[in-house]
From Swiss-Prot:
The keyword rRNA-binding does not apply. Residues 1-22 form the signal peptide. Expressed by the skin glands. Disulfide bonds join 61-67. It is found in: Secreted. GO terms for biological process: defense response to Gram-negative bacterium; defense response to Gram-positive bacterium; hemolysis in another organism. This is Brevinin-1CDYc. Residues 23-45 form a propeptide. Pfam families: FSAP_sig_propep (PF03032). Its main location: secreted. Antimicrobial peptide. InterPro entries: Frog_antimicrobial_propeptide. The keyword Signal applies.
Length: 67
């Protein structure tokens, strides 16, 4: 019974360490994503440019009234 308790304690201890390491890695990944504003700016620019290019023909049609 004592060896079973030791084994369970060891498994619990190793599992706890593993979970804490995973949590630290996940937190580091989240911080890295939050710390990179350039990537967000590029994504916003891409979305803005695609919307602007999609609306350009409609705008030109309204301005020149030649559809």
């Amino acid at each position: 019974m004592f060896t079973l308790k030791k084994s369970l304690l060891l498994i619990f201890f190793l599992g706890t360490i593993n979970l804490s390491l995973c949590e630290e890695e996940r937190n580091a990944d989240e911080e890295e994503r939050r710390d990179d504003p350039e990537e967000r700016d590029v994504e916003v620019e891409k979305r803005f440019l695609s919307l602007a290019l999609a609306a350009l023909p409609k705008f030109l049609c309204l301005v020149f009234k030649k559809c």
